[in-house]
Amino acid sequence: MTRIQKFAQVAVVALLAVLAISVALPASAHAQSDATAQRIFRIGMDSSWAPKLSQTLFDSIGPRLTASPAHHAAGDWVTKMYKEWGIEAKKEQYGTWRGWRRGTSHIDLMQPRVRSLEGTMLAWSPGTNGRPVTAEAIILPKFVDSTEFVKWLPQARGKIVLLSPSFPTCRPSEDWLKFATAESMARMDTTIALMNREWAVMTDATGRPDSTKLYRGTGYSLALGTGTLGTRLEKAGVAGMISSRNKLSGFTNPFAGANGGGRGGAGGGRGGRGGAGGSAGTGSMRGGGPGAAGTAANAGRGGFGGGPGGAGGWGVIEIFESYNTIAPAVTLMCEDYSLVYRLAENKQRPMVRLDLDASLLGEQPTFNVIGQIKGTEKPNEYVMLSAHFDSWDGGSGATDNGTGTMMAMEAMRILKLAYPKPKRTIMVGHWASEEQGLNGSTAFTADHPEVMKGLQALFNQDNGTGRVQSLSSSGLTDIGPHLKSWYGILPSFFTDSMSSNVVSWSFNDVPTGNPGGTDGAVFACFATPSIGMGAVGWNYSTYTWHTNRDTYDKVVMDDLKHNATLAALMVYAASEDPTFISREKSPGQWPANWPANCGTPPRSTKPRL
């Protein structure tokens, strides 16, 4: 999911957790005697294909950057699997997006000593066309304004520009909390606070971003990767650019307070699942112990420990994108980026060699994968599984959102075996370009008004590998009673309040904010019953969300089996429900901007550029 949208989504979930009506009812006698429900449960838990499917998708095919060759190969594979199971499926093109092929990345320090550096290209970066580029690395200065920046640009010609701050320690916050003296921690606090202030987006007198200054006074944005600043530097003739977005610093992860640690105030220590904060870190790293679950009111603003940077995961970097077409853009791990930065800072003239294999492929077809099991009694009413199929490609796209994809695929396989003649049509949507702004799902809703009209329920999952522990929705008067009745179909495995597998449901009459930053939010524009599936964390935001460590080994297969089985059971219950969910909105004062994800979907890269 996208960073800003993810922040909005988790803010809503946090508020729902406080305000919503939550119940955990004992399983009904009907659940224990329903032969189809029991068959679904046994197939899902005893003969899961999740490990086999996951290994093929994550290891063999790999990450699914929108419109890349791997994205197309993955779409062909999913379609093939569905057809082998007797499920109708197709790749449904809705537009184009810029295509890109990732090859090898070799990044080396050549002077003042030789060292291979740990890093890779940003997505959509140009390569070096078979001719390695060696150039001096220089730090992007801080400018008074964009005029001063333009005057400086000739000095950057032929150089590799360092675009990020050098984080003063690459150790995790836990080390500092456990081993550091009070004096040492205080000094590190001050150093980090100064770094954040020095590299933060520049603001005007009202505290809003100053459009004439923005990042380092350049007047350009760094965005998720190199942004418009990268294209301006490219125009000036730089040889390349290097950034580093580690998970240690509030600065490098300014919106992660939604999942970061601590209770806020002066920082939050190691932090559990923090609140809805989003400012650059300015506080202390001495917050006490694991942070409690938070809301917008107590969100962490800490510097190192519990602030917006989260729990301080190390050994990971976030890998996003570049809009360059000539100058390559790479990202380095914290340790190696800091090495190059210190050499440049101390005027020791680091020379870096980039040898990068990549192909910019121009606009390529992009698509959603749509599958269905046709309904026998009400074929024009639909129950839908939803998960985005695309990913960033620094890792394997395993937990974001390969596990959501696997949940949906495995649930469809189970349903075809245990419930082959559903009352309503069962659909699955594997969306493209979620990471670029929910583009694939938005296009589907625009192209399929008949599905929007007949949608009984949509179940969306996009929050990592953990087992689903909550089902939640809001806005429509009729959703609550239906969720309650569907809950009654679940075997005791999911309803025993003493079990770690227990699943609760919640309903909030009036939405408390924007419906969030994943594809389920798009369906709220059409007042459809969109149900979110909330999962346990497994340090998702800290270690695998958008990082180089989002790989097969991070998947918790038992939790994935749990999720696929639960999804299949809920789809079965929604399909069998004798009544259709009303579109009547709940009374009350709704947020003025709700929902905020509506609009015309981009059908090509051009609007983004």
Q: Where is each model-derived feature located?
A:
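N-terminal hydrophobic or amphipathic helices/low-complexity stretches enriched
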Residues: A29-H71, K80, I373-E377, E584, ...
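Bacterial N-terminal signal peptides
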Residues: V10-A24
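Metal-dependent peptidase/peptidase-like ectodomains
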Residues: R113-S116, G130-A135, V144, P154-G158, ...
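Short helix-loop-beta-strand segments that form the rim/entrance of peptidase-like active sites
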Residues: K52, I414-N439, L458
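Noncatalytic luminal/extracellular "stalk/propeptide" segments of secretory-pathway proteins
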Residues: S33, R42, Q55, D59-T206
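Active-site-adjacent substrate-binding region
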Residues: S211-G217, S221-L222, G230, E234, ...
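Disordered, low-complexity segments in secreted/periplasmic proteins that are enriched in proline
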Residues: R208, R216, L248-G315, R603-L609
